[in-house]
A protein has these predicted regions:
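Conserved catalytic-core motifs of GNAT/GCN5-like acyltransferases
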Residues: 105, 118, 123-140
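Extreme N-terminal starter segment of soluble prokaryotic enzymes
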Residues: 2-3
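Conserved hydrophobic beta-strand within the GNAT/NAT acetyltransferase core sheet
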Residues: 68, 102-106
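Conserved acetyl-CoA-binding loop-helix of GNAT-fold acetyltransferases
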Residues: 79-93, 115-119
């Protein structure tokens, strides 16, 4: 059984290992820790039964917009629904924080992630040319509009 929870400072090593396993140009451990500790950020982790971090997600809150910065699942644990669970939970948390719009970027070649985001209500709204490096690639901007809380 896995646990989905808010990230703690003590999770930084696990988050960093996921970052290195998933991204060709990973954030440094220091950058991740700095980001984790800022008040207007939300971070989640997926923790395995043995306590190992197998995924994480991060977001920034800017005015009434949430920017999902990273969603990463260790390659050995992909296709098990953890990415969708984290995205749903992060979306709920951003909504509770008053965010009216949520944005993210995804590599144009990452068809699986795009399909997941579409299933969760995100739509493509633009392209950031040469947004990614190693390899250089465009980033598809996807957005989700949040309904008002009743």
């Amino acid at each position: 059984m896995v646990t989905l929870r808010e990230a703690l400072r003590s999770d930084i090593e696990g988050i960093y290992q996921i970052e290195k396993a998933c991204f060709s140009t990973p954030w440094s451990k220091e950058a991740l820790l700095d980001d984790l500790e800022v008040e207007d950020k939300l971070y989640l982790v997926v923790e395995a039964e043995d306590g190992k971090i197998i995924g994480y997600a991060g977001s920034w809150l800017v005015l009434d917009e949430g920017q999902i910065t990273n969603i990463a699942i260790h390659p050995e644990h992909r296709r098990a629904g953890y990415g969708a669970k984290m995205t749903r939970k992060l979306t709920q948390m951003l909504r509770k924080q008053g965010m009216k719009h949520i944005f993210l970027e995804v590599r144009v070649s990452n068809i699986a992630a795009q399909a997941m985001y579409r299933r969760l209500g995100f739509t493509a709204v633009g392209v950031r040319k040469q947004f990614y490096s190693d390899p250089v690639e465009d980033g598809l901007i996807m957005a989700k509009e949040m309904e008002e809380l009743a």
